[in-house]
Amino acid sequence: VVVDAVGHGLLTLDDLERSHVRGFDFEAAWRAVEPDDVVTLIYTSGTTGPPKAVQLTHASVLFECRALQACLPYQSGGRMISYLPSAHVGDRVLVHYGASICFGQSVVSVADLRQIAAAMVEVRPTVFGGVPRVWEKLKAGLEAAGLRDPSQLPEAGKALVRARLGLDHCTLCVSGAAPAAMEVMQYFSGLGLSLNEGWGMSELSCFATVNPPGDIRMGSVGKALPGVELRLLDDGELLVRAPLVMKGYRDDPQRTAETLDADGWLHSGDIATIDGDGYVRIVDRKKELIINS
């Protein structure tokens, strides 16, 4: 099913909505849904290789949303911008399922990435997230305008810059999907916008770790979400066990078994360290590549 294209062999969303299946009972169908039923498929290559269809369930997505809500300032009535591809687990799960359905926030969708800056000023999001490349571009734009070191501005000046960015109402700035450069983190911290870096993957319904607000440690991806277990193998590979772990790869038992062991631990492929306070740092990749934008 495609949203905004037509072609041979494609079913458009409009056609799907207009279709009628004889004898289909919507009321009975939705009431028959169980927590372990698949709610969505996220296609991922795991950075390289043939695509895999990650099966996320109603239970795994709800666990992810509730765990994030327990430790981050997601307030009802807030505002978010959807601009990442909906194939991205962050946009689909955190924005459309989490912010809109679970948290009761308004979501404004922006199809043209060139309009993001204008949308930020118009929407004034209360939560704004992006991959590191987004934050790098915002930093580059401010530097091009002459703001080399925002930490030297008086508080009134910082507030003015935040307002011009459209982030003056933002209580949570998130960076994820790849490591953010330290200079980017420090730049926005100097502006009064602490980037909350987290770690996760499609197979984990998005985030498994985040930095606690008020206790952000730059260079780390934070601590495990409530209810999430972390473990390191002897080679440093980070393993995760929690209700947010995927059901498996659709119709691919071999690769499912390679990722999920018999005890329910998901093998992430990332090499990490965990300090005495529970903060995780990703230091290497056991296999494949890290995507940074």
Please describe what each predicted stretch is.
Residues 1-35, 142-164:
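ANL superfamily adenylate-forming
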Residues 126-129, 138-216, 229:
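Gly/Ser/Thr-rich phosphate-binding loop
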Residues 62-79, 86-160, 194:
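Conserved AMP-binding/adenylation subdomain of ANL enzymes
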Residues 21-43, 50, 73-79:
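Conserved pre-ATP/AMP-binding loop-to-beta segment of ANL
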Residues 39-63:
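Conserved AMP-binding A3 loop
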Residues 38, 44-47, 80, 85, ...:
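Conserved S/T- and glycine-rich ATP-binding loop of Class I adenylate-forming
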